[in-house]
């Protein structure tokens, strides 16, 4: 999906349509990119409390559509320390839990987001343990717990030849 910077309403509608489509095909989980709700690069918008609150409202709207399907939605999220890049894990019951990016590695992000979160979290869906990792935190993971069945990396990094191969090699 192609998300537009600052167009929370349109981005949310795209996400909801994709959730409805995945649900109609019997999917248990659907995942979206880092900053899917806000679009990226959002830079200066991430310093606006109103913008961050609108993103949180959008995640709540998306959660209402997640009855019977889980979703992982990339969004900025305002914490007590400041805005973070997060993945909103929305359960099949519509409950929201935010998983935040731990490291701010790109200079272009510095000053807009803080990196003080846990960085990754294991969730369980239909008996499968899935590790959800936000942003470039995947490049700092040394090893995975053997109980993890799959990794979902919510990342908005630009395409670069060989990047995926290097990431897999690190894991």
Regions of interest found by a model, annotated:
Residues 1-171:
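Enzyme catalytic cores with a strong preference for nitrogen-chemistry domains
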């Amino acid at each position: 999906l192609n998300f537009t910077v600052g167009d929370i309403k349109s981005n949310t509608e795209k996400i909801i349509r994709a959730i409805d489509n995945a649900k109609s095909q019997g999917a248990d989980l659907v995942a979206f990119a880092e900053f899917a709700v806000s679009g990226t690069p959002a830079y200066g918008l991430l310093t606006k409390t109103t913008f961050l609150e609108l993103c949180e409202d959008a995640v709540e709207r998306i959660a209402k559509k997640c009855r019977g399907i889980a979703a992982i939605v990339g969004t900025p999220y305002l914490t007590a320390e400041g805005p973070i890049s997060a993945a909103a894990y929305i359960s099949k019951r519509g409950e929201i839990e935010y998983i935040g990016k731990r490291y701010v590695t790109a200079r272009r992000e510095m000053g807009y987001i803080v990196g003080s979160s846990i960085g990754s979290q294991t969730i369980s869906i239909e008996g499968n343990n899935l590790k959800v990792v936000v942003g470039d935190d995947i490049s700092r993971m040394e090893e995975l717990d053997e109980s993890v069945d799959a990794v979902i990396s919510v990342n908005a990094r630009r395409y670069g030849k060989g990047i995926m191969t290097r990431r897999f090699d690190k894991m």
